[in-house]
Amino acid sequence: MNHDSRTYPFKFSIITAVYNVASYLSGAVESILCQDIGFKESVELILVDDGSTDSSGEICDHYQALYPYNIKVLHKPNGGAASARNAGIALASGKYLNFLDGDDKLSPNTLSAVYNFFSTVDDQISLVSVPIQFFEKKENAHRLNYKYRDGKDQIIDLNVQYSYVQMSIASSFIKHNVLNDHSFDTSLRYAEDAKVIMQLLLDHPYYGIVPSGCYYYRFRNTQNSALNGTKLHREWYLDCLKNYLQWALHSARQKYGKIPFFVQYNVMYDLQSRFGVPEIPESVLTTAEHLEFRTLLKELLQSIDDKIILEQKNLSREQKDYIISFK
């Protein structure tokens, strides 16, 4: 990988897209202030207020007044998480970037653990991830945390460990100089973060894992676990499939002449939840759109080997058989 010889004033820039999270934002910020790597010496926090209508913007300004050297605040009209993150990247001056959500937290040792690992393998990878732990309404570990079960910092070779999916940008730490060549797709309401990560991994199918760090993902008490809000939006069924999953398969085929297993596994992991929706309301998809959705599913599945479907870790044998027959 290209060596980055530039000097950065901060080890990390934490970029947070802020939208109506007044009840939680202080917790997110405080989790950065208390990082044992040393906030004042090592960390820049960029708070992008994306047109909040509650007091989130004022909370951003409050913290900037307390730490004017370390905290930058940008107030902008609402444009979505992708546009807010892109705006934050333009302001960043840290060597490594992270995209903490405004209602989540990092464990106090996360930045030091990630930095220490990067310092030993900096020329080999551009991305490091940490485990995700849910809190508030749910308190279990993320289903992809099996990647960290060995408990060791290590480099993942996706050519071999193709089931070690990484989709969350919030639990990722990425080299600034590498991310400069990419941006978040503002046409996507969902999976804009996964698309950026896929771009990076298509270029270089290796990344690091640091099991001792932790990203705390707030599963809010107001969320309905039976029918997640994403399943009530047209974009999750159509735009995400066309502008992320189809794009991923096409890009992989163009680059490699085939679709590597790690791309197939990633796409199938993302697709599987679409088969768990009992009935899509007409208020979400029209009859024509529902037909388009089913056609897209079939087209995507044509590019996925049965082997990859059968190796999914969160589907029953009956579900796997159904998906294979659906092809």
Where are these regions (language model features)?
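Nucleotide-sugar donor-binding/catalytic module of glycosyltransferases
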Residues: 1-247
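Hydrophobic/aromatic-lined pockets within catalytic cores
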Residues: 119, 205, 249, 253, ...
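Catalytic core of nucleotide-sugar-dependent glycosyltransferases
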Residues: 216-221, 227-256, 280, 285-306
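Terminal low-complexity segments of carbohydrate-biosynthetic enzymes
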Residues: 256-260, 267-327
